From Swiss-Prot:
Homodimer. Within each dimer, one monomer is responsible for RNA recognition and catalysis, while the other monomer binds to the replacement base PreQ1. InterPro entries: ArchSynthase1/Queuine_TRR, TGT, TGT-like_sf, tRNA_ribo_trans-like. Pathway: tRNA modification; tRNA-queuosine biosynthesis. Binds 1 zinc ion per subunit. The lineage of its organism: Bacteria, Pseudomonadati, Pseudomonadota, Gammaproteobacteria, Enterobacterales. Pfam families: TGT. The keyword Nucleus does not apply. The active site is at D89 (proton acceptor), D264 (nucleophile). This is Queuine tRNA-ribosyltransferase. GO terms for biological process: queuosine biosynthetic process; tRNA wobble guanine modification; tRNA-guanine transglycosylation. It comes from Pectobacterium atrosepticum (strain SCRI 1043 / ATCC BAA-672). GO terms for molecular function: metal ion binding; tRNA-guanosine(34) queuine transglycosylase activity. It catalyses: 7-aminomethyl-7-carbaguanine + guanosine(34) in tRNA = 7-aminomethyl-7-carbaguanosine(34) in tRNA + guanine. Catalyzes the base-exchange of a guanine (G) residue with the queuine precursor 7-aminomethyl-7-deazaguanine (PreQ1) at position 34 (anticodon wobble position) in tRNAs with GU(N) anticodons (tRNA-Asp, -Asn, -His and -Tyr). Catalysis occurs through a double-displacement mechanism. The nucleophile active site attacks the C1' of nucleotide 34 to detach the guanine base from the RNA, forming a covalent enzyme-RNA intermediate. The proton acceptor active site deprotonates the incoming PreQ1, allowing a nucleophilic attack on the C1' of the ribose to form the product. The gene is tgt.
Amino acid sequence: MKYELQTTDGRARRGRLIFERGVVETPAFMPVGTYGTVKGMTPEEVKETGAQILLGNTFHLWLRPGQEIMKLHGDLHDFMNWHGPILTDSGGFQVFSLGDIRKITEQGVHFRNPINGDSIFLSPEKSMEIQNDLGSDIVMIFDECTPYPADWDYAKRSMEMSLRWAKRSRQRFDELENKNALFGIIQGSVYEDLRDVSVKGLVDIGFDGYAVGGLAVGEPKEDMHRILEHVCPQIPEDKPRYLMGVGKPEDLVEGVRRGVDMFDCVMPTRNARNGHLFVTDGVVKIRNAKHKDDVSSLDEHCDCYTCRNYSRAYLHHLDRCNEILGARLNTIHNLRYYQRLMAGLRQAIEEGKLELFVVDFYQRIGKPIPPLAEKDVAASN
């Protein structure tokens, strides 16, 4: 993988990730394909929304169908018939979400298989081996996702363990002679001094890109923005920056304003299945009765298959009848909305008009613009 930074507007960056399997224009949003599928979508449909890279889930694919089934097909790309780049998370977030059925040690994490109750062990080395078998174009290190809230002492211990695991991930990745990209994950909760130690430690080890982890886990938005403003300038300029598990459209806008290049989240697909649809002027709750006889399209500014062919009344009808097609059409639209948003951000950065884009975006959705730190305002001016 090669990252090319093309231009900037304030802290925001316009670039591209170059893989053997294709080019990803950044800032980029990655749809989530947890079990080797973006729920309800064929790979061709996902591609038509504008997505250039997907996220796969190491933990879930390890449990089902398992490494051996994957290798029978070649790798994850062949298994799911997606031939663009794939980023896989390390499994750390899912393991630490298991709560009482897992035990963290220096060596790794012991836990009960949530499917059948079997005792399983996942370590940095094992995560690297699984992701190698998946053929991931971007491999994520195995880390401890620090919960929120966490006091300073706990966050420090967690961050330091993640750094030790980062070294082990790097070592095993290199031993496997994996030629793809390996990203480090910056931890430290909401504490700037701990984030400083994490960034420096990871940069000293050396990675192909750097993710900001441990955000979007319940902390106030102001803390997320503060940490991004503090951390992003410390990441080497020639390496991509990835904000994990984020988020709402406004979170993507704010991440881009602060220098983030990559995002992923289940929100567009999960919300689509629940009838919450993102449009230029905010959110449409399609199951509300007011849409029962609305013959207009979902979003007159959208060029997706759903908006070109179906009315709000039809989408409302499908939702009320729990028809599978409704979830599919909703998902097509939400994914396209996210890709259109990212394309708009990229164009605004290219033209040096990002703040005008931001003003228009917030006016349309009827929300105030979150302030940038003073040094970021100076950069954008």
